[in-house]
Amino acid sequence: MTKLQQTLYQFFGFTSFKKGQQDIIESILSGKDTIAMLPTGGGKSLCYQLPGYMLDGMVLIVSPLLSLMEDQVQQLKARGEKRAAALNSMLNRQERQFVLEHIHRYKFLYLSPEALQSPYVLEKLKSVPISLFVIDEAHCISEWGHDFRPDYSKLGQLRKKLGHPPVLALTATATKETLQDVMNLLELQHAVRHLNSVNRPNIALRVENAADTAEKIDRVIQLVENLQGPGIVYCPTRKWAKELAGEIKSKTSSRADFYHGGLESGDRILIQQQFIHNQLDVICCTNAFGMGVDKPDIRYVIHFHLPQTAEAFMQEIGRAGRDGKPSVSILLRAPGDFELQEQIIQMESVTAEEIADVIRVLEKTEERDERRLRDVLLQYGVGETQARMMIHLFMQGKTSVELMKKEISYRMELKLEKMHRVSFLLQRDGCLRQALLTYFDESYEPDDGNLPCCSHCGFDLSLYEQKGERSKMAPLDSWSSELHRIFSLQTVGELN
């Protein structure tokens, strides 16, 4: 048994790696900058956690996902690793200060890109050796990526300030142009690239047409009642997530709830935990749900709407079947779906007058901390996405109405272009899997016939239906107390 295999078994209890993991880890251990693409459920976290036990110094993980940070830290602690912490907005001032004052004691530190931009945090990080700088969801760096986050664009410069540690840039879905953008912005021209297929052959792909929205609702009810769960229903808006969850609860025997970014942090975590621990059968949600939720046995994902990008679609269906067992993705399509998504994107549009007002507000704000600026804009009534983009442009010195309007219009055009492309992919004749893989510049060789492919190639949906009674669930109040326990954990106690 090699040292790598010994470490894998000692700290994670596995006797073998998932496809692609070992090559990525060996690249990291050789000290090379690495760009890695693994499909959702491919085991990305192990690719940096295992090297952490074989390298001196801290592993610093930048992630935009609060739920992912908390989940990963709890998993590490459950395995007996006390040297893990997350530095984000969920910590109160005292907890945050404790982590920073004891920063030399941590092996794994998760933090948001916003936290990393704090001069105080940066100075503390400079005092410890960093063996690996991990950028999770690396596609957020690129304007071509489906989830561009302006805060990510500064990570290349921040890496230099931290002493230029080796980088691992991770993503589950990215096109060639997005990956090239990531390489350029992080200055990773000589990085080793390990790009695994986005294909998930254990997930059958199905597109169904409905006459109207009412028919789609009826079909969701039917699918949730009949399919083997648990499952996720992705919805276009917060309102739809809440309404569909209500319909499912009133018309089926399934335990359902809704989830979106507008819920209080405690409510979001409670719903996640109830779902993970089988106290809910189905979650109706916006795209705020799923990333960082580690549940391997999700059996189906339903899209009640047209996704905005092919990348988002692949990530969202990838929540299913992470245990490798047969699962199904179903997209429900009806007239007007495209126009609805177009309206949602165009809601991000702002007039020249609104931009001028925002610039005046930003210029009057004495504190130029990005978090403070964002809070000001949110109080002013600017949307989260708009606020992120406007502050990014403002901090770059693009403070004229014309420049800001031009950049925002460009972003909207990119989003509309991507939506047109995914709409075309999902409506064209031919194998759906092949069309999606072609979008990601992958060739596709059909399976030998053992695994169902897509609705064009044909498969029997009854294969994914329940075979017996729904399993009974634990009382919900057990997780209310567990949530209280999680929030009551003292950072001091965890390290001592």
UniProtKB/Swiss-Prot annotation:
| InterPro entries reported in the protein's UniProt record | DEAD/DEAH_box_helicase_dom, DNA/RNA_helicase_DEAH_CS, DNA_helicase_ATP-dep_RecQ, Helicase_ATP-bd, Helicase_C-like, P-loop_NTPase, RecQ_Zn-bd
Q: Which residues cross the membrane?
A: none
**What chemistry does it catalyse, as a reaction equation?**
Couples ATP hydrolysis with the unwinding of duplex DNA by translocating in the 3'-5' direction; ATP + H2O = ADP + phosphate + H(+)
Q: Which UniProt keywords apply?
A: ATP-binding, Cytoplasm, DNA damage, DNA recombination, DNA repair, DNA-binding, Helicase, Hydrolase, Isomerase, Nucleotide-binding
Question: In what residue span(s) does the Helicase ATP-binding domain sit?
Answer: 25-192
| Localization terms from the record | Cytoplasm, Nucleoid
Superkingdom classification of source = Bacteria
The principal localisation class reads: cytoplasm
Task: List ligand-binding residues for ATP.
Answer: 38-45
Motif DEAH box: positions: 136-139
GO CC annotations? bacterial nucleoid; chromosome; cytoplasm; replisome
Q: What happens when the gene is disrupted?
A: Cells lacking this gene have an increased sensitivity to DNA damaging agents, 100-fold decreased plasmid transformation and 4-fold reduced chromosomal DNA transformation. Sensitivity increases in the presence of mutated AddAB nuclease.
The GO terms describing molecular function are: 3'-5' DNA helicase activity; ATP binding; ATP hydrolysis activity; DNA binding; four-way junction helicase activity
* Biological processes annotated in GO: DNA recombination; DNA repair
Tell me which residues make up the Helicase C-terminal domain. Answer: 219-363
Q: State which Enzyme Commission number(s) the record gives.
A: 5.6.2.4
Q: Name one Pfam family in it.
A: DEAD
Remaining remarks: The stop codon of ypbB overlaps with the start codon of recS, suggesting they are translationally coupled.
Q: Describe the family membership recorded for this protein in Swiss-Prot or TrEMBL.
A: Belongs to the helicase family. RecQ subfamily.
Record-linked PANTHER family? ATP-DEPENDENT DNA HELICASE RECS-RELATED (PTHR13710:SF84), DNA HELICASE RECQ FAMILY MEMBER (PTHR13710)
**How does this polypeptide assemble, per the annotation?**
Interacts with SSB (ssbA) and YpbB.
Its function, per the record, reads: Probable 3'-5' DNA helicase. Required in synaptic and/or post-synaptic stages of recombination. Probably has an overlapping function with RecQ. It probably acts to help generate ss-DNA from ds-DNA breaks.
| NCBIfam families noted in UniProt | recQ_fam (TIGR00614)
Designated name of the protein? Probable ATP-dependent DNA helicase RecS
Natural source organism: Bacillus subtilis (strain 168)
Which gene underlies this protein? recS
